[in-house]
Amino acid sequence: MSSNKLTTSWGAPVGDNQNSMTAGSRGPTLIQDVHLLEKLAHFNRERVPERVVHAKGAGAHGYFEVTNDVTKYTKAAFLSEVGKRTPLFIRFSTVAGELGSADTVRDPRGFAVKFYTEEGNYDIVGNNTPVFFIRDAIKFPDFIHTQKRDPKTHLKNPTAVWDFWSLSPESLHQVTILMSDRGIPATLRHMHGFGSHTFKWTNAEGEGVWIKYHFKTEQGVKNLDVNTAAKIAGENPDYHTEDLFNAIENGDYPAWKLYVQIMPLEDANTYRFDPFDVTKVWSQKDYPLIEVGRMVLDRNPENYFAEVEQATFSPGTLVPGIDVSPDKMLQGRLFAYHDAHRYRVGANHQALPINRARNKVNNYQRDGQMRFDDNGGGSVYYEPNSFGGPKESPEDKQAAYPVQGIADSVSYDHYDHYTQAGDLYRLMSEDERTRLVENIVNAMKPVEKEEIKLRQIEHFYKADPEYGKRVAEGLGLPIKKDS
């Protein structure tokens, strides 16, 4: 007789898991069959809400090893010495697709890393591109609505996509990247990752710098052409997920080098554009890459739901020595991500094994749905108190910085949406430009209103006249004389 007994969720042995309890062989099923009721009820509740963005994803465990001394820039403990290793979990994803969507579509890829440090978890929640479509979080719900399905037809709507982009010229840099060869990575292993936003590092003396993160793939950058990507999407929609899993399973561990760009605090006041604008990159001639360490992925998840689906990341998950910047998009994400996790996974999502800090969590938060640890036990549950409860550590406060201005709804004061998009276009080879234009033309052909196409062409033209002319020719449309 097997010692591996099937049990109910409350631990009692199950006598029959093949036949419902009925009144005779042909009689009705009995409500007293509590095992049947529990089994069906749990099945009805197996799904949690799908992520509103980045729903389709793959993940892996690994480690980060420091390869260069950066202690003069940050006091973060996990970066404190060369050779130090920190365990991590990463989740890659597409942005717009649903859980069952194809991997090889034209879409930015999420690149979210959770470091399990001795000072708590630290998340870098970025993409495989260094910029984004918008720079103020107030526009994010509208932007994502255009990327998702039309509420009337339940179909993707190219008119909505290009209408929004053409009315949001700050998107041009990211649109150019998306429509280029880089828009469809060959695999998750063959793409770079970026923190995208500007962050602040502070050292033990309280001295700060602005930084940007760059993860450079050691596998080399490889992309898919449109026809190959479409073929794979039809034959194996989980191609990227499968490739990552198989590579790690076969011992072919993917790795990335982490670099930072470092900007002195005072340069933010004089740089030629706002360094907190996530639609722009910092020139590497001005702020060269400095190596920090190496990330290696060497272990697959044991259970997709428990680890990849329930993993939660937020740019607000910070550790001492690393702070945020005034980037408006980043500031909105500080709220939105944690709030999304509270809705999707629950108020105590950070206590789940995949999200739980490796050091002791010590605070006065109590109760809430699915509180499954000791809930603080019998310890003091308020602060201040006279019973030896946990105390704040003033030395770990976020670094102070001066602010000024009038409280108002204010746009960014830099309106050059075209220089960097044009620079990127001119950096491309002739073949790369041809494919870029073909991708844009094919994506814009279904747009219903000609005025939307003309408006977008004008943006391309302002970035580079050749860029605009070639798109216009592909669509059979004129260039505005005043462009």
UniProtKB/Swiss-Prot annotation:
Subcellular locations according to the entry: Cytoplasm
Reactions that this protein is recorded to catalyse: 2 H2O2 = O2 + 2 H2O
Cofactor: heme
Phenotypic consequence of gene deletion: Insertion mutant shows increased sensitivity to H(2)0(2), reduced catalase expression and an absence of induced protection of the cell.
Induction details: By hydrogen peroxide.
Function recorded in the entry: Decomposes hydrogen peroxide into water and oxygen; serves to protect cells from the toxic effects of hydrogen peroxide.
The protein, known as: Vegetative catalase
Source organism: Bacillus subtilis (strain 168)
